[in-house]
């Protein structure tokens, strides 16, 4: 799923850095965030208000490293929500969610002076562009359960959404969760108002869509967006370079092993080079390293 904004798009992708902050992180109007959170945790109880928390924590590891998540807030009942949007590949994303949640859990326990009977609930929500689970469902809610699947504790809840697994069409979207994920997957592809689904007229989604409409942005907002686009492009370029270098390094290791094996078999320099698809100089370099060792 493409999350980077381009000049020909009318609507900014929600999963982009700017889009996430403009919708989920909209402190001036929290309607979208409240409805989205209610849908994501599958609650029948409306969230009336939210208060944004500091979204970093410092000095929690021995070497001073700190964690950072995209959004942290608390509702009117003291329930805590942590939301992170992940665009790139993150095979260990669940471990990161546990790290965030357990840090919050420790803070809640200390705040309650270790009275475990009054702990507020913690919901850690991870929204991912790519897949990390083997399950077929795009939305998963996880609690502590026994081997029979019976609930042991729901004080801490983990929610994962994998956008790539969502395949419902507009006409199939009936629940707020389905409407939310459909919007996140498609809003940046819309070029004409006639393409709007009927449910995009619902107030909570209109609030978010208006924030994503590049035509309604102030000059300052457009300037901020351009800065983020430049940063995103640079990040993508840097990440691509790292991936390329890693692949080249891995390829070099494989070729070196092939040359070493070929040398041990008594093949000539030319034969080793042809077998490993490398130059004769490369083979000679490996030979010198072997001799030195």
Each predicted region: which residue ranges?
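Conserved single-residue anchors adjacent to enzymatic active/cofactor-binding motifs
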Residues: 1-220
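Short, charged alpha-helical interaction segments and adjacent helix-coil junctions
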Residues: 1-9, 18, 81-86, 182-293
């Amino acid at each position: 799923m493409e999350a980077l904004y381009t000049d020909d798009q009318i609507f900014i992708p929600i999963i982009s850095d700017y889009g996430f902050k403009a919708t989920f992180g909209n402190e001036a109007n929290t309607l979208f965030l409240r409805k989205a959170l209610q849908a994501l945790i599958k609650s029948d109880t409306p969230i009336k208000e939210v208060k944004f928390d500091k979204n970093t924590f410092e000095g929690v590891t021995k070497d001073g490293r700190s964690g950072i998540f995209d959004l942290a807030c608390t509702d009117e009942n003291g329930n805590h929500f942590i939301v992170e949007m992940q665009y790139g590949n993150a095979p260990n994303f669940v471990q990161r969610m546990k790290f965030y949640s357990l840090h919050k859990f420790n803070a809640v326990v200390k705040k309650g002076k270790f009275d475990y009977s009054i702990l507020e609930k913690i919901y850690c929500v991870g929204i991912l562009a790519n897949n990390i689970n083997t399950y077929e469902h795009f939305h998963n809610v996880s609690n502590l359960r026994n081997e029979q699947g019976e609930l042991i504790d729901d004080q801490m809840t983990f929610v994962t959404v994998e956008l790539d697994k969502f395949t419902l069409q507009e006409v199939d979207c009936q629940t707020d969760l389905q409407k939310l994920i459909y919007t996140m997957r498609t809003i940046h592809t819309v070029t004409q108002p006639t393409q709007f689904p009927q449910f995009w007229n619902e107030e909570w989604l209109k609030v978010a869509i208006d924030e994503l409409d590049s035509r309604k942005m102030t000059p300052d907002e457009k300037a901020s967006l351009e800065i983020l686009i430049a940063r995103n492009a640079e990040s993508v370029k840097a990440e691509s370079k790292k991936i390329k270098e890693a692949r080249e390094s891995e390829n070099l290791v494989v070729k070196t092993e092939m040359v070493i094996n070929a040398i041990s078999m008594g093949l000539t320099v030319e034969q080793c080079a042809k077998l490993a698809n490398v130059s004769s100089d490369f083979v000679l370099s490996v030979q010198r390293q072997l001799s030195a060792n």
